[in-house]
């Protein structure tokens, strides 16, 4: 039946016309450096490097790696753990953004790094966790690297293979900025490198899935990029093109640092941000209640409750989520919250109290239907009531459901009929405001960020048949929301006008 559960984690890898090879360069910092005192605008004005994109990754095992930090502050050092049979490889650090359409800038490169094949992974039988035990290949100093979302590109120098390693160079302060909050815990939950994820094991089902997964392994999806390219990079591109004051962090950092979001104008949760710890959620809610806006640009957000544990490489490198087997979790027996869905017991705390909407199921593929064209989020789109955009709702969706805790006033501005395995429901785009002045905007569809890429008759980089008309809508609405949220507490000038009585017959 339609309900919680998951398909393949993302669309097919993006088509590209970029060359597979790597441009020559010297070891160390490459290209013009941004002036660290003149802000992100100077970074965006620098020329980009379109050769970042991998078109031919080569065979499995040709080269792969991971970083021993999910994020670093500028100037910190991290380790790269790389396995390749090639005698040497090149590593290039690309900061992702707009860069006049190039979408990335080469910040640093090291050539002729000695290669070596690392040991085969093994599996912890107690939790079915894939462990590598790989040795550090290279220490990388990020001095001079601007804050941002990065892809490190590994190129075997014999031409046999290419892979990515994602990294966030995070912001020490978020005050006055819209915070791009990457979701590496969700990337890792879906990562099947080594044959196991939080969804599947060798049998392809839940019975043999991992109960814990670790960041001490490569990502198997999208040539090592995890879910970043489909669910996050298009938003980074748009936000940087708009020239907004941005900060960068991850959900893991938000969980670890209670004051990290102090003074932020907005927090941006991207296309697939499913796995949260209670600490991350509490800190985002505290920011909302202090006037920080929240944009949820996807669906299925904050559905799973997790715990972070260390590995030998450092803190918070294990994602624990026992799900239905929560009672077997030794951590829970020792007093930690159950690592299961937020909405179920013990300690049920439905995510709708933060999001306004709540995850309602998958799989769906449905048109997106505008119902409040006069809402400020639709300014400049020219849409009318009933305007429909095929395939924009999917594959997972959210709705307003007052059977769960729902903030009021809340305004549903798109109310899209869906049929999920025979069950009729709706996907809702909703906006609510709170006494602090903060506004919370939730799209209600997981395809929102990917649809930012939809251009031309074939949809361009977007998948699922999403066309340029949907792309134009999503780009304009997202720009409206980002600009409004970057300007300060949106509820002070754009209070939500509750319309649930008209939409759902709910008082």
Segment roles from a protein language model:
Residues 40-62:
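Proline/serine/threonine-rich low-complexity linkers at boundaries of modular beta-sandwich domains
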Residues 155, 181-185, 249-253, 270-272, ...:
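Active-site-proximal beta-strand/loop segments in catalytic clefts of secreted hydrolases
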